[in-house]
Regions:
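Aromatic- and charge-enriched surface segment that lines or borders ligand/interaction sites
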Residues: 77-125
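Gly/Pro-rich hinge or "lid" segments in bacterial periplasmic/extracellular proteins
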Residues: 159-220, 228-231
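Surface-exposed binding/hinge segments that line
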Residues: 80, 91, 126-179
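Short, well-ordered beta-strand elements
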Residues: 27-35, 87-90, 109-112, 156-158, ...
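A bilobed periplasmic-binding-protein/Venus flytrap-type ligand-binding module shared by bacterial periplasmic
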Residues: 93, 206-209, 262-272
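Ligand-binding "clamshell"
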Residues: 252-266
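N-terminal lobe/hinge region of extracytoplasmic solute-binding protein
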Residues: 32-83, 114, 187
């Protein structure tokens, strides 16, 4: 599967607005995102829509949601449910490496989940004293997943809170190296890796030559950081950036333009 030149940039953004000409031959693209000046790039703790969308280029989950809203294996190679539907066994792909060269193992999946649970602060009854805004982006995972265990380096068994195929939707969170789950800018497994970050200014990404899938068509991505959506759209209007992420109500102002076009896509929350 070759990632398209637009979907490869922002796999889950609410809306893309792009210039109509000149992108196909480009080796780099610039995108406007809205984020705080003091943003920490910790993918399990983010709550900035634009940044989460951007970092879907850097990180991958066990499963991803396809265009038909169905979960499909990503870092997972295979999966199977127990007869009673209360457990699901997931086998990892054996050709996955993080950007730091480390091979993906089940220990990384377990450590990622352990840290997510720590952030959420849930007890056995899913009670938590942690404010919702501070529980991390993926705390709802634990409404479906009760416990997890690595049975070997390539296999994880998940115990579910209820028998449901829908539990696979909960396994789309990004997998991080066990040693970097709480780190800033941890290594990922995706088609792009970090090339730099200046708070309040920009995030730079470069193509991951060691990616397990076919290489992306765009080599470099610069994400310029703006305080507001209006500032981001103004940057697009003045051609300071190639892409602006925004909601459809804002994109409608470009509907009659011959120099731009819009692409609508789902976020992790299935917004449009």
């Amino acid at each position: 599967m070759r990632i398209s030149r637009f979907a490869a940039l922002l796999l889950a953004c609410a809306l893309l607005v792009l210039p109509a000409a000149g992108l196909a031959a480009s080796t780099s693209l610039s995108v406007a995102i809205v984020a705080d000046d003091h943003l920490a790039l910790r993918p399990l703790e983010l709550n900035h829509r634009d940044v989460v969308s951007l970092l879907n280029l850097v990180y991958e989950g066990l499963f991803e949601i396809d265009d038909n809203y169905q979960p499909q294996p990503k870092l997972a190679y295979a999966y199977s449910f127990s007869n009673d539907g209360r457990k699901v066994q997931v086998t990892l792909r054996d050709d996955i490496s993080f950007h730091n060269g480390q091979t993906l193992t089940s220990a990384d999946v377990v450590a990622t989940l352990d840290y997510m649970l720590e952030l959420a602060g849930f007890n056995e009854n899913l009670d938590s004293e942690v404010p919702v805004a501070d529980r991390g982006l993926y705390y709802s995972t634990f409404y479906s997943i009760k416990s997890w265990e690595a049975t070997d380096e390539q296999t994880i068994v998940f115990t579910l809170r209820r028998a449901s195929y829908g539990s696979l939707y909960a396994l789309t969170f990004p997998i991080l190296p066990a040693s970097q789950v709480a780190a800033d800018m941890p290594a990922g497994t995706g088609p792009y890796k970090y090339d730099g970050y200046e708070q309040g200014s920009a995030i730079w990404l470069t193509a991951n030559d060691g990616w397990w899938n076919l290489p992306p068509q765009v080599r470099y991505v610069r994400a310029s950081i703006y305080d507001t959506a209006e500032q981001a759209l103004n940057a697009f209007d003045t051609q300071s950036v190639d892409i602006a992420m925004t909601r459809s109500i804002n994109a409608s102002r470009y509907s009659g333009s011959l120099n731009t076009f819009s692409i609508t896509a789902r976020t992790r929350q299935l917004e449009v």
